[in-house]
């Protein structure tokens, strides 16, 4: 079989021109995120296919330890919901102020028994509002948007496919691929040579499981509300700050009761029971999370298998599951 994606190709990089649009987030009719002891069990996720092995599952199962990146506890947050736990890896490299804010709020127990006050099928689940006030926010300064970053060649983002930056402004295209196990997009790093600062713009994508900050029409208004996407939402690209990614528990997000508290006072939303910084848990209670290194030979082989199963062409980068291994703590 001809290898479609060599490790050399995976070493490429990419990013995009920051767009700005301000959707009318206060209008609930618009689809934008708005403000207002047994042995430990290991599990590996790499996508499933209706009772059959997912493409590349054999490669994932046999990948050497060197092909996996262990996620430090400092990067992990655990959201406890009425439907189960959601494990999130944060991305301070892309949104340092937002990650710091949500860590601070978790330490202050701000989210305890807040609600998922706006949950839309095929879109996202927004949380952080109060049962009696869906527009509630923490008494914190508003954050400046961290929609994109500027980077040089020392930060690698793989270039796998072309992508429209934002379909609402179909005027520019970028390249899409992976950074550190996150789906990302970027201007081609080759363009850095013609930039005064030697850098290009890059951002994390709104694929399913993206964790981002909710805001009003003001791009610099995020405070404490957040949302988790339940599907790919490309119309939000580069206009909302993505600060994390669900590594386990997306099914709990997708099972949340749907509705909008601001529009239907009879809606009974699910609760956020707690948000925990994994590093604050006793060592014996911390899960071990490993994400396949998306610059490794094993991931290149995995991509090749995924492409071969799809007629020789990679699917949309948002439809490619990044393999994750989780070692749960002993109960």
PLM segments and residue spans:
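C-terminal motif of bacterial Sec signal peptides marking the signal peptidase cleavage site
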Residues: 22-24
């Amino acid at each position: 079989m001809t290898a479609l994606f060599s490790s050399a190709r995976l070493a490429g990089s990419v990013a995009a021109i920051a767009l700005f649009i301000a959707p009318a987030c206060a209008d609930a009719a618009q689809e934008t995120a708005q403000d207002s002891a047994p042995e430990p069990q290991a599990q590996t996720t790499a996508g499933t296919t209706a009772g059959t092995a997912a493409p590349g599952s054999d490669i994932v199962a046999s990948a050497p330890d060197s092909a996996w990146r262990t996620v430090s506890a400092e990067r992990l947050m655990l959201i406890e919901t009425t439907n189960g736990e959601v494990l999130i890896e944060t991305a301070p490299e892309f949104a340092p102020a937002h990650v710091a804010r949500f860590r601070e709020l978790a330490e202050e127990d701000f989210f305890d028994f807040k609600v998922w006050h706006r949950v839309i099928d095929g879109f996202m689940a927004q949380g952080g509002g109060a049962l009696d006030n869906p527009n509630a926010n923490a008494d914190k300064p508003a954050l400046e948007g961290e929609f994109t970053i500027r980077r040089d060649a020392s930060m690698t983002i793989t270039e796998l496919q072309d992508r429209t930056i934002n379909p609402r402004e179909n005027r520019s295209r970028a390249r899409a691929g992976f950074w550190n196990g996150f789906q990302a997009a970027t201007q081609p790093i080759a363009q850095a040579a013609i930039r005064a600062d030697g850098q290009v713009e890059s951002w994390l994508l709104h694929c399913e499981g993206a964790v981002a900050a909710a805001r009003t029409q003001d791009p610099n208004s995020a405070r404490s509300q957040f949302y988790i996407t339940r599907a790919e939402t490309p119309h939000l690209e580069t206009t909302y700050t993505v600060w994390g990614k669900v590594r386990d528990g997306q099914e709990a997000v997708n099972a949340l009761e749907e509705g909008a508290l601001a529009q239907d006072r009879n809606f009974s939303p699910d609760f956020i029971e707690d948000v925990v910084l994994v590093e604050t848990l006793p060592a014996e209670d911390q899960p071990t999370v490993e994400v396949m290194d998306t610059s490794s030979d094993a991931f290149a082989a995995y991509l090749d298998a995924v492409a071969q199963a799809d007629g020789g062409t990679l699917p949309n980068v948002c439809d490619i599951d990044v393999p994750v291994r989780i070692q749960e703590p002993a109960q």
